[in-house]
């Protein structure tokens, strides 16, 4: 403020060049180092953070009253070309299975069924890459949300030895929603090992 004069402390803390506000700041710093206690100045509480602790709502911290979002991600592939005897979906129209799980953070991917079950409500990203090898038939692969085909991809060039049906999508899911791949047309005999299926949680809702 214009014309305002600094206030000085009486006694031993009085110094011609030491304004009151600097003395209070110095005292507050000393109290914070000793006991990390709040500093009370004119009825306002100044919270002293603990050293090395992330501030709430800042980088590495969640907002007050909220838990950090869970980490959810999976990636699965085939370890061999042909379906083992006794498995369903052995090259004919049906569910596409993946027997080798590379990542399953959050435990949402079920290897037995080849499907992902959403553990939390949120927006998820999914990607699949399904290959046909030495196969002149058209292959159609659909990504299924429960029983609904969301997107489909095709591999239909008869003149190439290897071709992939590949696509990706973002989906809002509720807990318990199931996402899987289904072979809607053609067969994958000989090309299983080059196929993959992956997904992850982008953010919770």
From Swiss-Prot:
Gene3D superfamilies: 2.60.120.40. Residues 1-32 form the signal peptide. Glycans are attached at residue 90. One of its GO terms (biological process) is maintenance of synapse structure. It holds the Pfam family C1q. PROSITE patterns: C1Q (PS50871). Residues 72-205 are annotated as: Necessary for interaction with CBLN3, and homotrimerization. GO terms for cellular component: endoplasmic reticulum; extracellular space; Golgi apparatus; parallel fiber to Purkinje cell synapse; synapse; synaptic cleft. It is found in: Endoplasmic reticulum; Golgi apparatus, cis-Golgi network; Secreted; Synapse. It comes from the Eukaryota. InterPro entries: C1q_dom (IPR001073), Cerebellin_Synaptic_Org (IPR050822), Tumour_necrosis_fac-like_dom (IPR008983). Residues 67-205 form the C1q domain. Transmembrane segments: none annotated. Keywords: Disulfide bond, Endoplasmic reticulum, Glycoprotein, Golgi apparatus, Secreted, Signal, Synapse. May be involved in synaptic functions in the CNS. Heterohexamer; disulfide-linked heterotrimers. Interacts with CBLN1. May also form oligomers with CBLN2 and CBLN4. This is Cerebellin-3. It comes from Homo sapiens.
